[in-house]
Amino acid sequence: LWDCRGETAWEGLVHRRCRMSPSSPTGGAAAPGPAAADGISIRQVERAGWELIQATVEVPVEGWYWRVTHELARRTSPPRPDAVENGTLTAPGARFDTPSGCVFYRLTDSDVVSWAQASGDRNPIHLLPGRAAEAGLSVGSGEVVAHGLLLGAISLALVQPSPSWQVGLVFIGSADVPASECGAEESWAMLAVDPVSGDITQGR
């Protein structure tokens, strides 16, 4: 995507799902997939006003090839008046009930910016307040969002490891992070992580 579109490759992208599983030993005779010249397979379709993207790659990790599949979406037309927008981890006004044993994490907008810079994710929804709302997410004009792999990394860091060697991350919503104003005390979003399931809930 970056090679084809440059900076615009990141505009408005929303991470929907990530699946990771071992496919074969790196020393085996089988060649890694997917069968693309650069080792990356990208599928794109247009549906109901959205561009849907699936990217698959295999990477070597500690003697195994791991197949990693990312599913992303980008709005291509304005939403209908009756359309249901992408949600957040906690709907506005909802009670913040968490299972017992949850681990709490304070996420600031500077954390989101640091993640975006370290990971090379130049998506403006992480960096510029208001851009997430323009991309179709249900957030305020003074907020940036954390979603996708940042939330997945927080979950994986705290959840109990799976014996199946498979990781499936489903990103059902974003965490709305208030942008701190210059000279004001730093604001944050409060996240609760279930250490058993890895589910993340956002407090208000």
Per-range role (PLM):
Residues 6-7, 43-46, 161-162:
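Intrinsically disordered, low-complexity segments enriched in polar/charged residues with Gly/Pro
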Residues 16-107, 174-177, 182-204:
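HotDog/MaoC-like acyl-thioester-processing domains
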Residues 1-2, 117, 153:
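Short, hydrophobic/amphipathic alpha-helical patches that form generic packing surfaces
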Residues 1-32, 133-140:
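Hydrophobic, proline/glycine-rich low-complexity stretches
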Residues 132-203:
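Catalytic-pocket segment enriched in acidic/His residues
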Residues 73-145, 160:
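Catalytic strand-loop segment that frames the active site of acyl-thioester-processing enzymes
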Residues 15-17, 126, 147:
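Histidine-centered active-site/metal-ligand motif
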